[in-house]
Amino acid sequence: MRFNIYLIHILYFSNFITMNKKQKYLTVQFLIMVFTILSCYSFSQAYDSGNDSLPESDFSWPEGKRMALSLTFDDARLSQPEKGIPLLDKYGVKATFYISPGSMMKRIDDWKMAADNGHEIGNHSVMHPCTGNFTWSRHKALEEYTLERMMTELDSASRLIKELLGVDPVSFAYPCGQTFIGRGINTRSYVPLVAMMFESGRGWLNEAPNDPSFCDLAQLNASELDGKTFEQVLKLIETARAEGYWLILAGHEMNTEGNQTSQLETIEALCKYAIDPDNGIWIDNVHNIASYIRHNRK
């Protein structure tokens, strides 16, 4: 780059003082353009070089596992205790269920049993607020929330779960995967609030697994499980395992058909695959894996 700058200096500066006003203007504009291009090229080279030289992580999963996997489900849908949890229990797989107290109260005894059996109960707010661009969320739109209102709601949800199930939630899932409150210049992220109140916060419809040596536990990526075949999910698993990452799958209904439904056939195939020691997968609930990461990464 120094050579290029020197060349420009030789070509233009020596004649600059003899140029008319228009020529000087065009020359300056040309030099600005060249410097901009060279700067962008230099940055690109540095970025690529940095990517190539990233140090290898010394993070390792327990018992020589090559990746971690968590199955998570939202909203305390009725199909979860009716059909999904018995299937998970059949294979000894522990999942995380992010519940809203209103839905949970329809099957309190079943949710108590699930918690006692090692499934994690997480916080998913009281009202399930999302952007008001969803008409069903207009009366509880995130655009109308304040941080104080959100903090009160999340605390209320945790208190209700504690009162009804005897569980202190340490994991949270952002409703609709949205992490903002307010509008325009008054928009605020409530990720710091979640980081203060919980061990982890899970997103929704993300495109990558989580690097245990780097990920922000308050903003965990989660890939959709709803509507997926085992073959489709297996590709996500293979990607995560190649990097030693943590794949979080997120779903809603646990049934054989319907909208926002994680297929029982897919879940069963996942369980069988994940518990096979040859596949090198640590499958566990979000809390257990997040806690391990928090205590073991440098």
Segment roles from a protein language model:
Residues 40, 180-182, 256-261:
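A generic structural signal for short coil/turn motifs at secondary-structure boundaries
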Residues 47, 54-63, 103-106, 198-213, ...:
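C-terminal domain-boundary segment and adjacent tail
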Residues 47-134, 138-145, 153-179, 238, ...:
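Active-site beta->alpha N-cap acidic-glycine motif
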Residues 69, 246-248:
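Residue-level preference for the first positions of well-ordered beta-strands
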Residues 83, 105-106, 133-233, 266:
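Catalytic domains of cell-wall/extracellular-matrix polysaccharide-remodeling enzymes
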